[in-house]
UniProtKB/Swiss-Prot annotation:
Family note: Belongs to the UPF0114 family.
Record's bilayer topology term: Multi-pass membrane protein
Any matching Pfam family: UPF0114
GO CC annotation terms, alphabetical: plasma membrane
Regions crossing the membrane: 15-35, 53-73, 136-156
Keyword field: Cell membrane, Membrane, Transmembrane, Transmembrane helix
Domain of life per record: Bacteria
Subcellular location per the Swiss-Prot or TrEMBL entry: Cell membrane
Protein name: UPF0114 protein YqhA
Source organism of this protein record: Escherichia fergusonii (strain ATCC 35469 / DSM 13698 / CCUG 18766 / IAM 14443 / JCM 21226 / LMG 7866 / NBRC 102419 / NCTC 12128 / CDC 0568-73)
HAMAP family: UPF0114 (MF_00143)
Length: 164
């Protein structure tokens, strides 16, 4: 009975495979939205105010960071929790594949969230005249919470690695 339960639990990791594949579909949706934004801005590029263009560019950078985060979580999560990726030797392989454990993935995700939050906060500040002060305060508090969380996670990781 114990062996059956252990084998069933171990095999259940494959339930995550469609979830990671779903992230690739989310990446496709993000790419479509990215190019929709570019197609939307190109006809108006010469009549746009510089600040409006910068806001669009910040949105594109934001989407790019989210896309990178999706790729990192998709590949690293699959390799850490489901199965090793079998990439043929003659194909280009990302140099971090197979080297990122769950802790380093968590730290990279936290750093990505801080970067995404920074871009979002910059967009908010560029339009600060249209954002109520209490909302600005909450954006800053939430961003600082992300920064503090990432710092604490990195610090705790460093402590545990140093003690082992």
């Amino acid at each position: 009975m114990e062996r059956f339960l252990e084998n069933a639990m171990y095999a259940s990791r494959w339930l995550l495979a469609p979830v990671y594949f779903g992230l690739s579909l989310a990446l496709v949706a993000l790419v479509l939205k990215f190019f929709q934004e570019i197609i939307h801005v190109l006809p108006n590029i010469f009549s746009m105010a510089e600040s409006d263009l910068i806001l669009v560019l910040l949105s594109l950078v934001d989407m790019t960071l989210v896309g990178g985060l999706l790729v990192m979580v998709m590949f690293s999560g699959y390799e850490n929790f489901v199965s090793q990726l079998d990439i043929s030797e003659n194909k280009e392989k990302l140099n971090w594949l197979g080297k990122m454990d769950a802790t380093s993935l968590k730290n990279k995700v936290a750093a990505s969230i801080v970067a995404i939050s920074s871009i979002h906060l910059l967009r908010v500040f560029m339009d600060a005249k249209n954002v109520p002060d209490n909302k600005l305060m909450w954006y800053v508090i939430i961003h600082l919470t992300f920064v503090l969380s990432a710092f604490v996670m990195g610090y705790l990781d460093r402590l545990t690695r140093h003690n082992h």
